[in-house]
């Protein structure tokens, strides 16, 4: 069974990544981003794989700008918190520069979910990518 984050989980992860208290600009956008990984269509998961769910969360948080500042950092932290509580670890030696590039791409361009999911899987510890 997949475990999901709630609003407070996302804000906590984001505050840690941001290094201070986050200011929410729009709670509706924040709640929509938090709910997106759980979306279903006619009772079927809209995002069936764990990587798809994490990508949906990351994309929505990075692009919706629900926060005054720290949207990309919160998106990264929330996606990896979500993956962590579902048994996936971030590789200790992940490419920080590539992660930063990914977040900038997601925030400023139309990145499809499959590409984001594949990138996230590439950052996972080797034994976790299956």
UniProtKB/Swiss-Prot annotation:
It comes from the Bacteria. It holds the Pfam family Fic. Residues 5-126 form the Fido domain. Keywords: Repressor, Toxin-antitoxin system, Transcription, Transcription regulation. InterPro entries: Doc (IPR006440), Fido (IPR003812), Type_II_TA_Toxin (IPR053737). Disruption phenotype: The phd-doc operon is not essential. A triple TA mutant (missing vapB-vapC, mazE-mazF and phd-doc TA systems) survives antibiotic challenge, suggesting the TA systems are not required to generate drug-resistant cells. However the mutant is more sensitive to oxidative and heat stress, and does not survive long term starvation during aerobic growth on complex medium. There is a difference in the level of branched-chain amino acids, which may play a role in monitoring the nutritional supply and physiological state of the cell. GO terms for molecular function: kinase activity. This is Toxin Doc. The gene is doc.
């Amino acid at each position: 069974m997949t475990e999901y984050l709630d609003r407070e989980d996302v804000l906590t992860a984001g505050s840690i990544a941001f290094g201070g208290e986050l200011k929410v600009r729009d709670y509706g956008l924040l709640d929509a981003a938090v709910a997106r990984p759980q979306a279903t269509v006619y009772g079927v998961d809209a995002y069936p794989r764990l990587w798809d769910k994490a990508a949906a969360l990351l994309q929505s948080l990075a692009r919706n700008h629900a926060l005054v500042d720290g949207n990309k950092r919160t998106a990264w932290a929330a996606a990896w918190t979500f993956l962590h509580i579902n048994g996936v670890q971030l590789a200790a030696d992940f490419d920080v520069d590539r992660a930063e590039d990914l977040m900038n791409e997601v925030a400023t361009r139309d990145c499809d979910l499959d590409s984001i999911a594949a990138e996230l899987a590439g950052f996972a510890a080797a034994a976790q990518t299956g």
